[in-house]
Every structure is written in structure tokens, then in C-alpha cells.
Curated annotation (Swiss-Prot):
Annotated PANTHER family: CHEMOKINE-LIKE PROTEIN TAFA FAMILY MEMBER, CHEMOKINE-LIKE PROTEIN TAFA-2
Highest classification ranks of the organism: Eukaryota, Metazoa, Chordata, Craniata, Vertebrata
Residues in coiled coil: none
Chief place where the protein resides: cytoplasm
InterPro entries referenced in this protein's UniProt entry, alphabetically: Chemokine-like_TAFA (IPR020350), TAFA_chemokine-like (IPR051743)
GO annotation (BP), single: memory
Keyword line: Cytoplasm, Nucleus, Signal
Cell wall biogenesis/degradation among keywords: no
Task performed by this protein: Has a role as neurotrophic factor involved in neuronal survival and neurobiological functions.
Family: Belongs to the TAFA family.
Pfam families noted in UniProt: TAFA
Keyword Cytoplasm: yes
The protein, known as: Chemokine-like protein TAFA-2
Length: 131
């Protein structure tokens, strides 16, 4: 093989290695940035949404939330959005005290106290608490 061909091949391999190392560095940097991301104290953010329908064609939604609450607060729902609420509300299952429904909706605690419903006219949204 001639010397020029070997130089080009070596240069090509070197460029590929640099590209892979750069790409790998960005992936690692991105992963570390995601792990280090903090939610401002007293606030919540949705990190994942899930939506599907069951056999009865009733839409089911769930979400994963990341909150950073002040002492004495826990993750809850206010005006249909994730929020930090007084821990006693959740401990005693006084769900409607955290004002989980939108304005104009009526809040009712479910009979088994494992959640609440928000109703307006003939529309009912039920929320079950899972830990």
C-alpha cells in the first residue's frame, strides 16, 4: 500500500474516533445534567404523562410528578395541577381541602377515601391516590 493511502485511512479512523468520543461526552453530560436537575423548593413539575382507554372507553390518565416541598408539605393537587400541600390534608385524607378541582367544579371525597371526584354538570373526573 502506498503511504498516502495509509495516511488518509488513519486520518479517517481518527475523525471517526473523535466523533464517537464527542458524541459519548455529550450523552454523558446530558445524563448528568438530567440527574442534577432540581425543582425549585415549593414547586412541582410533571416529568411523565400516561394516557389510555379501558374496556369501557373511559379515558384514564396518570402522571409522574417531581416536587420539592417545604417542611410540613407533601405532593398534592391544587386546581387540577400538581402542587405542594399541607401534609395533614394527605395524612387525614381530607382531599377536598387542597382544592384539587378547577373553579366551578364540585369536589367530593370518594366513599373509600382513596381519592376524590370533581364534577361539573354531567362530567365527572375521578382521581385515585396511589403511592
Amino acid at each position: 500500500m502506498n503511504k498516502r493511502y495509509l495516511q488518509k485511512a488513519t486520518k479517517g479512523k481518527l475523525l471517526i474516533i473523535i466523533f464517537i468520543v464527542t458524541l459519548w461526552g455529550k450523552v454523558v453530560s446530558s445524563a448528568n445534567h438530567h440527574k442534577a436537575h432540581h425543582v425549585k423548593t415549593g414547586t412541582c413539575e410533571v416529568v411523565a404523562l400516561h394516557r389510555c382507554c379501558n374496556k369501557n372507553k373511559i379515558e384514564e390518565r396518570s402522571q409522574t410528578v417531581k416536587c420539592s416541598c417545604f417542611p410540613g408539605q407533601v405532593t398534592g393537587t391544587t386546581r387540577a395541577a400538581p402542587s405542594c400541600v399541607d401534609a395533614s390534608i394527605v395524612e387525614q385524607k381530607w382531599w377536598c381541602h387542597m382544592q384539587p378541582c378547577l373553579e366551578g367544579e364540585e369536589c367530593k371525597v370518594l366513599p373509600d377515601r382513596k381519592g376524590w371526584s370533581c364534577s361539573s354538570g354531567n362530567k365527572v373526573k375521578t382521581t385515585r391516590v396511589t403511592h
